[in-house]
C-alpha cells in the first residue's frame, strides 16, 4: 500500500473503500482524557475560585471573537459549566431553567456544579500557541469542509476538571463520587468563530443535577448544552439559540457520539462577519466527495441523537430541485478523494511551521484541492449534478489510525491484491454504518436473518465475522473479543409485542412478525387503518400580524391499504388556518409514513416506526416568507395510535378569507442515507375566489431523522431514492367548526418517468375493492385477492373486528383483564399486580423491603433506639430519650448523676429512665419532698398523699385528688394527665354524667343554681333521656352527651370513659373524619363563643414594643408575648386585642405593612388590624366561610391563604379580601394548618383526617399539588416554614412529635417526641414556640437539642390556638 508520509507517519490518500471502513471503526473509541487540549497552570491557565456559584473576573481578550452577529472582547467563565460575554446573574435565575437564558451563553455543560472543598477545578486562558491553534484548525476543517482554509489566530480554552454536582449537606452522608471532566475551546481567525466541546471517555459521570428548590427529590434536570444569544434589545423577545440536549439520553450521547466523526468531540460555527442566523453544527456525515461542488442538503449525522431543539440543515446550500436533477454515473472510488486525517495528539516538540505548510493540517484531496472546492473555489454560484447513489451512503472521512492515537495498536495489514471489488452493478458505496462497527469489547453472535444468506461457524470466547457476500470475494475476517453486549435475552421487551428479537454480531435487533410492518420496536398490522393524535403549537407572522396558538388538537386517519391520509387540526386562529391551507406537507407526512408500497419499496413507518423527527423549511415566492415546521413522533399509545407533536414557527403569506387552495398531484423524491431521509422540491398552488385565480409557489426542504438498528446487515437491494406519488390533494378550512383539513392519497415506489406505460396492479395503485381493514395481495397482471388484516375476520371485501377477549383468542394470563381494541386487544393487570417479562402474565407486586420492619437494619435494640425508614432500603437510627449515641450504639444516660431529684429523695437509675422517691419522713413525688406531719389527715388528704407517693413511679398516671383548705374534696376534680374533669360528692365519689373530656368547659359542681326560666337545650334533654334509660348510672362503655353550663354541646364528645372520641358541631352532629382511636384525642374547636361575664374592653390595639415578639390567639383575644433573644419575657406579656363574641383561631402577620390578620370561627370572618396605637379591626372576608382555621400571609405577592375545615376548602385572596379564589375543594377532610414559602413560591397545609392524615404541598397558584408526608403522622395540628433554614416543621398531637423535613419531603427528622397536646407552632431563630392544650400555654423548644426551654401560662386558663412571630423586618431568601 502506497502512501505519503508526514512526520514519520503514513497519510492515506486513496484507498479502496472497504479498506477505509476498518480504520473508521477503530476510531469509534471515545476521546481519551489525554486527547483534550493541554491545560493546567503550566500552560498558563488561571484557576477559578472554589465554590457553588463563582464567576471569573472579566477576561480581556487580546483579539476579539464573534458570537452570532456581535463582536466582543470580554469573557466570563462560571462554575456551572458556562461561558458568557457578560457577568452572570445569580445562579437561581438560570441554573435550574431550560434554554434559552436571558443573557449570552456558551454552555458545554450547564448544571448546578459545586467545586467547594477541593471537588475539582475550573481553568481558563487565552492561547495563541501553534500546537493549540493547529489542533483547533484540524477539528474545524474536519467538521466544516467548506472552511478548509480556516486558520485561527487565537483561541480561548475553558476546562472543567473532575468537578462535582451540588449536593445538599446531610448528616452522616458522604459526598457522591461522580465527577465530570469536559472542555470548551473557542477559536477565531478574526472573521469566523468556532466552538469545540470535548467530552472524554468516562468524563461525564453525572448527567444532570437536582434543583435546589425541588418539590420532588426524584426530579433531576439534564444538563443544558448549547448556545444562546440572549434577550433582544427590547427585552420582549428571546434571541436565537441552539440547544443540543433535552433528555438524560441526549446528555449521555455527548461522549458516545459526535458531529465530526470522533466520539466526544463536537464542533459549531458560532459567529461570523457574514450573516449567520443561528449556530451551525458540524455535519461530516453529510459530505459527498465526488462532485462536491453540489453538496447534499441537510442530512442529520450523529448529532440528531441528541434531540436538538434547533436543527442545522444547511438549506442555503440547496441550489437545485431534486426533481430536475440529472443523475450521472460515477465510480465508488471517487468518494474517497478529499477526506482528511485529524491528528489529536500533542508531541513533545511542537511543530512550529505555519499552518498552511503542513500537509496534515488541511483536508486536501489527492490532487491537492481542498474538500468542498472541487470544481471551483466558490460553491454558491455553481450547480452541478451528482451521482444519485451517493445520497444513499456518503463516503466517510479518511482517517489515519496513527494520527488519531499514536500510542494505540495499528490495524492489521490488509491484502493489496485488489481482490476487494466495488458493489455489484455499480451500487452505492457502503457507509460506516453498513458493516458492524469494531468494538473490541463486544461479543459477536450471528443468527439467521432473511437478508443474509449465510452464517459463520462460531467458537467459544471469540467469534469470526466475515464481510457480507455482496461485498466481493475478499475473505478477510476480523476477530472480536467476547465481552458484555446487549442481547435479546435481556432486552427483548424493547421489541413490539408483534415482533421477534434476533441477536447479531454486535447486538440485537427487532423485526416485525409476518402480517405486520414497522421497524421492530413499533409494529402495526398490514392493511389495517391507523389513527394519529397530537398537539400543534405555533408562533407565526401571517403577513405582518403575529398569531400564536398552543396545544391545539391534531387527528389523522389513514386507510392503510390504499394510502389515503386524512388530517384535521382544530381551533387554529382563522388568519393562521387560512394561511396554512397551501401547506399540505403538514398532513403529507402521514402520506409518506403510511404510503401504499410498490414492490421493492418501503414506506416511512417500515423504516422509522413511531419515533422520528420531521423537520421542514418552506420558502414562499415571490415574497420569500419562510416557515419552519417540526413534527416529532413520540411512539404508540396503548390503542396503537401514533402520538405526534407539531411546532410551526416563521412567516407565511396572508391568504384572504373565503379563498380556497388547490394543489395539483405531485411527485417527491426521497433520498435515504443511514438514519436520515431528505427531500427537496418546488410546488405551485392556486388560490381562488369566484373569478379570481392566483398562482403562487413555495420551495420545501424536508429532513426526517430516526434511529436505526445498526447491528443487522443492511439489505443490499433497498433503493437509495424512492418516489412518492401524491394524488387527490385536498385542503379546506371550515370557519364555523374552526377545523383545518388536509387529505392526500400516496404511493411510494421507484423513480419512474411519467411516460412509463406499464399498467399497475390494483394493490399498488389503491384501485382494489378490498375492505379498508384488509390486505390486498397482488396476483398476475391486474388480478388480486383480499385478506382481512390481523384482528379482523371476513372474506377480505367485508371485514369486521374480531373480539379476541370474547372468543378467548388472547394471551392475557390470570389476574389480568383483556380489553378489546379495533383489530387488536390489550392486557391490563389487576390492582396489585404487574406484568412479568412476557408482558402477558401478571404477577403480584412485591412491596419494597423495609429494613425497619424485616429486622435487617443495624440500629440498636428497640428499647434503646428507633429505626426510621426513608423509602427503599434506606433508613436512619436515633437513640431513644434516656440513651445517648449514634443510633447504632446507644448507652444509658445516668440521670441520677445530674442531681434531678429533691435532696430529701433517693434517685433510682433504670435503663433509659430514672425515678425519684422521697426518703422516710418525707412525702411528695421525689422532685418535691415535704416533711411528714403527725397531725390527723382527712380522707381527701390521705388519698392525696397516697396518690403523690405512687406518682413518683415511672409511667404512673394516677389521679391526685384536689382538697380545699379544710381538707375536704373540691366539688370539681380534674385529672392532671388526661385533662378529664368531673364532679364528686362530699365523699369524693364521682357524680354520674358529669365527666367532661379535655379541652371542653368543666362541669358546674356544687350546690344547684337557683331555678331559671331557661328551657333545657337539645343536649340537656338528650342527656337526661339517656341517663333515665341507663337507670341513672351509666356503665363505663355507655355514651352520655356532654353539655356545658349553658346547655351547648361540648365540641369534644367521648364514648363513656373510653378514649373513643370525636368532634361535634353546635347541633351535636359528628364532624366527618374526626373519630379517633384509643390514646389520641381529636383537636376540636368550639363554634359558639362563651358569654362575657366581665366588662367588654374596647376592640382596639394596645401597641406592642419594638423588637421581635409572639402573637397568640386565645378565644376572644390576641395575646402579646415579647422575646428577649429567644427567651420568653413573661412579665411583659399582655393582651394586644380583645374581640367580644369571637373565637380567634388562625393568625399571621404582614411584615411589610405591619398588620396582623386572624380568622374567627364564631363570626365566620377573616379580619385584620394595624399594630399602631388605637388601630381598630377591619373585616375583609365575611361570606362563604363556616370554620376558617389556618391562615398564612404571602408578604411578597400580597396574598393570604386559609383553610375551612367544614367546607373542606383551601382558598386565597388579596390582602384586602378581593380576587378571592378556591384553590382546592377535593380530597380534603379536616384541613387545618397552612404555611407559605413566599420566596420559593410553595404552599403547604395539613389535613388531620383521622383515617388518612397527611401534609400536602402545591405552587401558590394551586398547580402541582401532591402529598408530601402521609406516613407516621396522627394529628398534625401545627405547621410552620422557616425561611432561613428552609425547613418545613409540624407539631403532631397524635404522635406527640415535633418533626421537620426539607421542602421536597426528604431529610425528615424528629426534634422532640414528648409533646403534650400541641395546636399551633412557629419557628424563630434556633427555637420553636407552640401552643399546648394540656398546658394551656406557650412552650418553647430548642431546635438543635429538642429540649423544652421555657413555657408561658397566661392568667386566663383556656385553650390557646394560633401563634405567629413578628419580626422587625421581612425575611429574605438570599443564600
UniProtKB/Swiss-Prot annotation:
Q: Which residues are glycosylated?
A: 358-359, 417, 452, 658, 693, 703, 1124
Sorted alphabetically, the keyword list is: Basement membrane, Calcium, Cell adhesion, Disulfide bond, EGF-like domain, Extracellular matrix, Glycoprotein, Methylation, Proteoglycan, Repeat, Secreted, Signal
Q: Which SMART domains does this entry report, sorted A to Z? A: EGF (SM00181), EGF_CA (SM00179), G2F (SM00682), LY (SM00135), NIDO (SM00539), TY (SM00211)
Annotated NIDO domain residues:
108-273
Chief subcellular site? secreted
Instruction: Spell out the GO cellular component terms annotated for this protein, sorted alphabetically and separated by semicolons.
Output: basement membrane; collagen-containing extracellular matrix; extracellular exosome; extracellular region; extracellular space; plasma membrane
Protein name (Swiss-Prot/TrEMBL): Nidogen-2
UniProt source species: Homo sapiens (Human)
Amino acid at each position: 500500500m502506497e502512501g505519503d508520509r508526514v512526520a514519520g507517519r503514513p497519510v492515506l490518500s486513496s484507498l479502496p473503500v472497504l479498506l477505509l471502513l476498518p480504520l473508521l471503526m477503530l476510531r469509534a473509541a471515545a476521546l481519551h482524557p489525554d486527547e483534550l487540549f493541554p491545560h493546567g497552570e503550566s500552560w498558563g491557565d488561571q484557576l477559578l475560585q472554589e465554590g457553588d456559584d463563582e464567576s471569573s473576573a472579566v477576561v480581556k481578550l487580546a483579539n476579539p471573537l464573534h458570537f452570532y452577529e456581535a463582536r466582543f472582547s470580554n469573557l466570563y467563565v462560571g462554575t456551572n459549566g458556562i461561558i458568557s460575554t457578560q457577568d452572570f446573574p445569580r445562579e437561581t435565575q438560570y441554573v435550574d431553567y431550560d434554554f434559552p437564558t436571558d443573557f449570552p451563553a456558551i454552555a458545554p455543560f450547564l448544571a448546578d456544579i459545586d467545586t467547594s472543598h477541593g471537588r475539582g477545578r475550573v481553568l481558563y486562558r487565552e492561547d495563541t500557541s501553534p500546537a493549540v491553534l493547529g489542533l483547533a484548525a484540524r477539528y474545524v476543517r474536519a467538521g466544516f469542509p467548506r472552511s478548509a482554509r480556516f486558520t485561527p489566530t487565537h483561541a480561548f480554552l475553558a476546562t472543567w476538571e473532575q468537578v462535582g454536582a451540588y449536593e445538599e449537606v446531610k448528616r452522616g452522608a458522604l459526598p457522591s463520587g461522580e465527577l465530570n471532566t469536559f472542555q470548551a475551546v473557542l477559536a477565531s481567525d478574526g472573521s469566523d468563530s468556532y466552538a469545540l466541546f470535548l467530552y472524554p471517555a468516562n468524563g461525564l459521570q453525572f448527567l444532570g443535577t437536582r434543583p435546589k428548590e425541588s418539590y420532588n427529590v426524584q426530579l433531576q434536570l439534564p444538563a443544558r448544552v448549547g448556545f444562546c444569544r440572549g434577550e433582544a434589545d427590547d427585552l420582549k423577545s428571546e434571541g436565537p439559540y441552539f440547544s443540543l440536549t433535552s433528555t438524560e439520553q441526549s446528555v449521555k450521547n455527548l461522549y458516545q457520539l459526535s458531529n465530526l466523526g470522533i466520539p466526544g468531540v463536537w464542533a459549531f460555527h458560532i459567529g461570523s462577519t457574514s450573516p449567520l442566523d443561528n449556530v451551525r453544527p458540524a455535519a461530516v456525515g453529510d459530505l459527498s466527495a465526488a462532485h462536491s461542488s453540489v453538496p447534499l442538503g441537510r442530512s442529520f449525522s450523529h448529532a440528531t441523537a441528541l434531540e436538538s431543539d434547533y436543527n442545522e440543515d444547511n438549506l442555503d446550500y440547496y441550489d437545485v430541485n431534486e426533481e430536475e436533477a440529472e443523475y450521472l454515473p460515477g465510480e465508488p472510488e471517487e468518494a474517497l478523494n478529499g477526506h482528511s486525517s485529524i491528528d489529536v495528539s500533542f508531541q513533545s516538540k511542537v511543530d512550529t511551521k505555519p499552518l498552511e505548510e503542513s500537509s496534515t493540517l488541511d483536508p486536501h484531496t489527492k490532487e491537492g484541492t481542498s474538500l468542498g472546492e472541487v470544481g471551483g473555489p466558490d460553491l454558491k454560484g455553481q450547480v452541478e449534478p451528482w451521482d444519485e447513489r451517493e445520497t444513499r451512503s456518503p463516503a466517510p472521512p479518511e482517517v489515519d489510525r496513527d494520527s488519531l492515537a499514536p500510542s494505540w495498536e495499528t490495524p492489521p495489514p490488509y491484502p493489496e491484491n485488489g481482490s476487494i471489488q466495488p458493489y455489484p452493478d455499480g451500487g452505492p458505496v457502503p457507509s460506516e454504518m453498513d458493516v458492524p462497527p469494531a468494538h473490541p469489547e463486544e461479543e459477536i453472535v450471528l443468527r439467521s436473518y432473511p437478508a443474509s444468506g449465510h452464517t459463520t461457524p462460531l467458537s467459544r470466547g471469540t467469534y469470526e465475522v466475515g464481510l457480507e457476500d455482496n461485498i466481493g470475494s475478499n475473505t478477510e475476517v476480523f476477530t472480536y473479543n467476547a465481552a458484555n453486549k446487549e442481547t435479546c435475552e435481556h432486552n427483548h421487551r424493547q421489541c413490539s409485542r408483534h415482533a421477534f428479537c434476533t441477536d447479531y454480531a454486535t447486538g440485537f435487533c427487532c423485526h416485525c412478525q409476518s402480517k405486520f410492518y414497522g421497524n421492530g420496536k413499533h409494529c402495526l398490522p398490514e392493511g389495517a387503518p391507523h389513527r394519529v393524535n397530537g398537539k400543534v403549537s405555533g408562533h407565526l407572522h401571517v403577513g405582518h400580524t403575529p398569531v400564536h396558538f398552543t396545544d391545539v388538537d391534531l387527528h389523522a386517519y389513514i386507510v392503510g391499504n390504499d394510502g389515503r391520509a386524512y388530517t384535521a387540526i382544530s381551533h387554529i386562529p382563522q388568519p393562521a388556518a387560512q394561511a396554512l391551507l397551501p401547506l399540505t406537507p403538514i398532513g403529507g407526512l402521514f402520506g409518506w409514513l403510511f404510503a401504499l408500497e410498490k414492490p421493492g419499496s418501503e414506506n416511512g413507518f417500515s423504516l422509522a416506526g413511531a419515533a422520528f423527527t420531521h423537520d421542514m423549511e418552506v420558502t414562499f415566492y415571490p415574497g420569500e416568507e419562510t416557515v419552519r415546521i417540526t413534527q416529532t413522533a413520540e411512539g404508540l399509545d396503548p390503542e396503537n395510535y401514533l402520538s405526534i407533536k407539531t411546532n410551526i414557527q416563521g412567516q407565511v403569506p396572508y391568504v384572504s378569507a373565503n379563498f380556497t387552495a388547490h394543489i395539483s398531484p405531485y411527485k417527491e423524491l426521497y433520498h435515504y442515507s443511514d438514519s436520515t431521509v431528505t427531500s427537496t422540491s418546488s410546488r405551485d398552488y392556486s388560490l381562488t375566489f369566484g373569478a379570481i385565480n392566483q398562482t403562487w409557489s413555495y420551495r420545501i426542504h424536508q429532513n426526517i431523522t430516526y434511529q436505526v438498528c445498526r447491528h443487522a446487515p443492511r439489505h443490499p437491494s433497498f433503493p437509495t431514492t424512492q418516489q412518492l406519488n401524491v394524488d387527490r390533494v385536498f385542503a379546506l378550512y371550515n370557519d364555523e367548526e374552526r377545523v383545518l383539513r388536509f387529505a392526500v392519497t400516496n404511493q411510494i415506489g421507484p423513480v419512474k418517468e411519467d411516460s412509463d406505460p406499464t399498467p399497475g396492479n390494483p394493490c399498488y395503485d389503491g384501485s382494489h375493492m378490498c375492505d379498508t381493514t384488509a390486505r390486498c395481495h397482488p396476483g398476475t397482471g391486474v388480478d388480486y385477492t383480499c385478506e382481512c388484516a390481523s384482528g379482523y375476520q371476513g372474506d377480505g371485501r367485508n371485514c369486521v373486528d374480531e373480539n379476541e377477549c370474547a372468543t378467548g383468542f388472547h394471551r392475557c394470563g390470570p389476574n389480568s383483564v383483556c380489553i378489546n381494541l379495533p383489530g387488536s386487544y390489550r392486557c391490563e393487570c389487576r390492582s396489585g399486580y404487574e406484568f412479568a417479562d412476557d408482558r402477558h402474565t401478571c404477577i403480584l407486586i412485591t412491596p419494597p423491603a423495609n429494613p425497619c420492619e424485616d429486622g435487617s437494619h443495624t440500629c440498636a435494640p428497640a428499647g434503646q433506639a428507633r429505626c426510621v425508614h426513608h423509602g427503599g432500603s434506606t433508613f436512619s437510627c436515633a437513640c431513644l430519650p434516656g440513651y445517648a449515641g449514634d443510633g447504632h450504639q446507644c448507652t444509658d444516660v445516668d440521670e441520677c448523676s445530674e442531681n434531678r431529684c429533691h435532696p430529701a429523695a433517693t434517685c433510682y437509675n433504670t435503663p433509659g429512665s430514672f425515678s425519684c422517691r422521697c426518703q422516710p419522713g418525707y412525702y411528695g413525688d421525689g422532685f418535691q419532698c415535704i416533711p411528714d406531719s403527725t397531725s390527723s389527715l382527712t380522707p381527701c388528704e390521705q388519698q392525696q398523699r397516697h396518690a403523690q407517693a405512687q406518682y413518683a413511679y415511672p409511667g404512673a398516671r394516677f389521679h391526685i385528688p384536689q382538697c380545699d383548705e379544710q381538707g375536704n374534696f373540691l366539688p370539681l376534680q380534674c385529672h392532671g394527665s388526661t385533662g378529664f374533669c368531673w364532679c364528686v360528692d362530699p365523699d369524693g365519689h364521682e357524680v354520674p354524667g358529669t365527666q367532661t373530656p379535655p379541652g371542653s368547659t368543666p362541669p358546674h359542681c356544687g350546690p344547684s343554681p337557683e331555678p331559671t326560666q331557661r328551657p333545657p337545650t337539645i343536649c340537656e334533654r338528650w342527656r337526661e333521656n339517656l341517663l333515665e334509660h341507663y337507670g341513672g348510672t351509666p356503665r363505663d362503655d355507655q355514651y352520655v352527651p356532654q353539655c356545658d353550663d349553658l346547655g351547648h354541646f361540648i365540641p369534644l364528645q367521648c364514648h363513656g370513659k373510653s378514649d373513643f372520641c370525636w368532634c361535634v358541631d353546635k347541633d351535636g352532629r359528628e364532624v366527618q373524619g374526626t373519630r379517633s382511636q384509643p390514646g389520641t384525642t381529636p383537636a376540636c374547636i368550639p363554634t359558639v363563643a362563651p358569654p362575657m361575664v366581665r366588662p367588654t374592653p374596647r376592640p382596639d390595639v394596645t401597641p406592642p414594643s419594638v423588637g421581635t415578639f409572639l402573637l397568640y390567639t386565645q378565644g376572644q383575644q390576641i395575646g402579646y408575648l415579647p422575646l428577649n433573644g429567644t427567651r420568653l419575657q413573661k412579665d411583659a406579656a399582655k393582651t394586644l386585642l380583645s374581640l367580644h363574641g369571637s373565637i380567634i383561631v388562625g393568625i399571621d402577620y404582614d411584615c411589610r405593612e405591619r398588620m396582623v390578620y386572624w380568622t374567627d370561627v364564631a363570626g365566620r370572618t377573616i379580619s385584620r388590624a394595624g399594630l399602631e396605637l388605637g388601630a381598630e379591626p377591619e373585616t375583609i372576608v365575611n361570606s362563604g366561610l363556616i370554620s376558617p382555621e389556618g391562615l398564612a400571609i404571602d408578604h411578597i405577592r400580597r396574598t393570604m391563604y386559609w383553610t375551612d375545615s367544614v367546607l373542606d376548602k383551601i382558598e386565597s385572596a388579596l390582602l384586602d379580601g378581593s380576587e378571592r379564589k378556591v384553590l382546592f375543594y377535593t380530597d380534603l377532610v379536616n384541613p387545618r394548618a397552612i404555611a407559605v414559602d413566599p420566596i420559593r413560591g410553595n404552599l403547604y397545609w395539613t389535613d388531620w383526617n383521622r383515617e388518612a392524615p397527611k401534609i400536602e404541598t402545591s405552587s401558590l397558584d394551586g398547580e402541582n399539588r401532591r402529598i408530601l408526608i402521609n406516613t407516621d403522622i396522627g394529628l398534625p395540628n401545627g405547621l410552620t416554614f422557616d425561611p432561613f433554614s428552609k425547613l418545613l416543621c409540624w407539631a403532631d398531637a397524635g404522635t406527640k412529635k415535633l418533626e421537620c423535613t426539607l421542602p421536597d419531603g426528604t431529610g425528615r427528622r424528629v426534634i422532640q417526641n414528648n409533646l403534650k397536646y400541641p395546636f399551633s407552632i412557629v419557628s424563630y431563630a434556633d427555637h420553636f414556640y407552640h401552643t399546648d392544650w394540656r398546658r394551656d400555654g406557650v412552650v418553647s423548644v430548642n431546635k438543635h437539642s429538642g429540649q423544652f426551654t421555657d413555657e408561658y401560662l397566661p392568667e386566663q386558663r383556656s385553650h390557646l390556638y394560633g401563634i405567629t412571630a413578628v419580626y422587625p423586618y421581612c425575611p429574605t431568601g438570599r443564600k
